[in-house]
């Protein structure tokens, strides 16, 4: 899995990169960005599974960055960090379906727990998608089988399967 850490404070970025054993959490690659625009460009090229982003950053705020990135990477999990408890930031985080909102100064255990929650959500999403694909394949296969038989015998089953497939 890939993680992008976006924060304009170099000490925060370096602290997160060096203080947490990302490999033990299943994070293979960690990317960094020092502002919202760099975060956007990095996310477009690296396609992270999880983004850990500060709210207030130069050039593009964390909220603006997240809104833009959700358009092209809708399955990316968001975790916001901020030293400010502004209600508008919290509303924006909820609207963007962020995993959580971690307050600064950061508690490393809280960050790890948040990332683990994002990993779990990502894996659940992949399993659900895989199950849906399998079910769709099975339904399509069954429909193809029914369509190769005499039509008048299986009209009810054909209708049921076409409804399932929305065709």
What annotation goes with each model-predicted range?
Residues 7, 54:
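Active-site residues of response regulator receiver
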Residues 10-31:
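Two-component/phosphorelay signaling modules centered on CheY-like receiver
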Residues 32-50:
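Acidic, metal-coordinating helix/loop segments flanking the phosphotransfer/catalytic sites
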Residues 35-38, 61-64, 82:
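Acidic catalytic/metal-coordinating carboxylates
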Residues 41, 63-74:
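Short amphipathic alpha-helix used as the core "switch/output" element in two-component signaling
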Residues 57:
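Receiver (REC) domain active-site loop signature in two-component systems and cognate sites
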Residues 106-167:
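Interdomain helical linkers/hinges and coiled-coil/dimerization scaffolds
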């Amino acid at each position: 899995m890939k993680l992008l850490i976006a924060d304009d404070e170099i000490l925060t970025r370096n602290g997160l990169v060096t203080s947490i054993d990302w490999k033990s959490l299943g994070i293979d690659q960690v990317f960094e960005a020092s502002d919202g625009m760099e975060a956007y460009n990095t996310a477009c090229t690296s396609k992270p599974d999880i983004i850990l982003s500060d709210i207030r950053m130069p050039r593009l705020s964390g909220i603006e960055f997240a809104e833009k990135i959700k358009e092209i990477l809708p399955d990316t999990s968001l975790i916001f960090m901020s030293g400010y408890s502004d209600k508008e930031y919290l509303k924006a985080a909820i609207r963007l379906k962020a995993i959580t909102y971690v307050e600064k100064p950061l508690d490393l255990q809280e960050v790890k727990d948040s990332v683990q929650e994002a990993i779990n959500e990502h894996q659940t999403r992949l399993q659900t998608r895989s199950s849906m694909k399998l079910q769709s394949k099975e339904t399509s296969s069954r429909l193809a089988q029914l369509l190769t038989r005499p039509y008048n015998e299986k009209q009810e089953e054909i209708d049921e399967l076409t409804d399932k497939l929305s065709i």
